[in-house]
Design a protein with these regions (language model features):
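Bacterial Sec-dependent N-terminal signal peptides
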Residues: 1-25
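Extracytoplasmic
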Residues: 46-50, 68-70, 76-78, 82-87, ...
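Acidic helix-start/capping segments at beta-turn-to-alpha-helix junctions
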Residues: 54-59, 106-126, 160-162, 183-192, ...
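Active-site-proximal beta-strand/loop segments in catalytic clefts of secreted hydrolases
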Residues: 56-58, 146-149, 157-160, 182-183, ...
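Active-site SXXK
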Residues: 81-108, 113, 357
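Active-site-adjacent helix/loop patches that line small-molecule binding or acyl-intermediate pockets
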Residues: 22-36, 45-48, 117-118, 122-125, ...
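A short, well-structured edge-of-sheet supersecondary motif
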Residues: 33-75, 357-359
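Structured C-terminal helix/loop/strand segments within mature extracytoplasmic catalytic/sensor domains
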Residues: 21-39, 45, 238-414
């Protein structure tokens, strides 16, 4: 009886757990056998650090077609983690898909997009000083999303897509557990259902106008999610109770990994999971998923703040490490509320090595949310560095029947 009561309390107060986490002994043994004392200590506390790791092995056949095998370590899609900026990946993909399906003459990702204010708390955007021409566009927002994980850029794509369109498209692609309910700005649930009017312009001429939208989509919020033991609310007052994440964005690690694969290898998965993108869209995404801040001229970034590995958790951000010129990470990370997440495709053009690696960890020793006291530097980034290095070193030695041709991912950066 005591055990049952304890289990019920765990489900209600912390994370809902309905099944055993998925773990492949191969991956667990590989990581543990090469782990430092620091990493072993983290791995021995799965309930504290809530880590999940997916390693995707890629083998090419004689036609260079990729074949994928996933290995899991403590992966549980029912265990909630806050996805933070990782939701920007599907949001960007839906924006490009929606543009292609609109099929309006003269309207593409490079066309000037003006955002109007149509409901309470909404803001308008009529200029963008980060772009070469000083005007906002879908393309410029996507650049900023992948280069430095810009929040306002995400908000503008969220508004262009509309909450309902975003979620219904993702669900139709099979991502039933994914939900994107909110901008990254202080708004309530009702305000996030309203999205702004949008205008696409060229030389002062209106090409297409999208009216304000209201989302009537129904979300399943029956599973209550509480994290921590205290939190600061929007008024910066300390509340001595767990923080409620029931209505927050959700993106399971397995879904994030599959979305990344579907973009980098569009013919590799089920047809229904593919995004309706053009060849130019794919090339554009590959460039800005892998480009480093110093390589960008528009936007131009202060490289002291936005250093090479600013968005590259696997396996470089710890210590603000420089990334070797022969290695590129095509990825999307997220960080918020003590959760760090990254899903990456790593390509080593010198050694002809490629693999995917995805992971999440929770580093919040004091259990207080929104206090900006998280162990990102001490524990989080070193976790990604060491796990990534272990997998990379294994890949360097792993025999391959066919050497991959990675030319599709070799990009000339401006």
């Amino acid at each position: 009886m005591k055990y049952a009561a304890s289990l019920l309390l765990l489900i209600i107060i912390t994370f809902s757990v309905y099944a055993q986490p998925k773990t492949d002994s191969f991956l667990e043994n590989l990581i543990r056998s090469n782990a430092s004392p620091f990493l072993k200590d983290v791995l021995n506390q799965p309930d504290t650090f809530q880590y999940q790791i997916i390693y995707t092995r890629i083998n090419r056949d004689k036609r260079n077609k990729p074949h994928f095998k996933n290995f899991y370590f403590n992966v549980d899609r029912n265990r909630y983690f806050n996805p933070a900026s990782t939701v920007k990946l599907p949001t960007a993909l839906i924006a490009l898909e929606k543009l292609n399906e609109l099929n309006k003459p003269g309207v593409d990702k490079y066309t000037t997009m003006l955002t109007d204010s149509s409901f309470e708390k909404q803001t308008s955007i009529l200029t963008d000083t980060s772009s070469g021409g000083g005007l906002p566009s879908i393309a410029q927002y996507i650049r900023k999303i992948f280069l430095v994980s810009d929040n306002d850029a995400y908000n503008r794509l969220y508004e262009f897509n509309g909450q309902q369109t975003t979620n219904e498209k993702l669900w139709r692609k099979g991502y039933k557990d994914t939900r994107i309910t909110r901008r990254f700005v202080t708004m309530n649930e009702e305000q996030n259902r309203h999205t702004n009017a949008i205008r696409f312009m060229k030389d002062g001429r209106l090409l297409y106008e999208q009216p304000p939208a209201y989302s009537t989509v129904s979300f399943d919020f029956s599973k209550k999610i509480w994290i921590g033991h205290a939190h600061y609310n929007r008024d910066d007052s300390l509340i001595n109770s767990p923080m409620d994440f029931t209505t927050h964005n959700n993106l399971p690690l397995e879904d994030l990994r599959q979305m990344l694969q579907s973009v980098l290898f569009p013919s590799s998965g089920p047809a229904k999971q593919q995004f309706n993108l053009t060849k130019d869209d794919y090339n554009f995404l590959y460039q800005y998923m892998s480009e480093l801040p110093y390589e960008s001229s528009h936007p131009k970034y202060d490289t002291t703040e936005f250093f090479d590995s600013y968005t590259k958790f696997f396996f470089f951000k710890a210590g603000k490490e420089k990334i070797p010129s022969h290695i590129r990470s095509f990825n999307k990370p997220g960080w918020s509320y003590g959760f760090l997440t990254d899903a990456a495709y790593i390509a080593d053009f010198k050694n002809n090595v490629e693999f995917m690696i995805s992971g999440v960890i929770y580093v919040n020793k004091d259990g207080v949310l929104n206090d900006d006291k998280y162990e990102y530097e001490e524990t989080g980034y070193p976790f990604f560095k060491e796990v990534g290095t272990i997998i990379y070193n294994y890949e360097l030695k792993r025999p391959r029947k066919y050497i991959p041709d990675l030319s599709n991912f070799k990009i000339i950066y401006h």
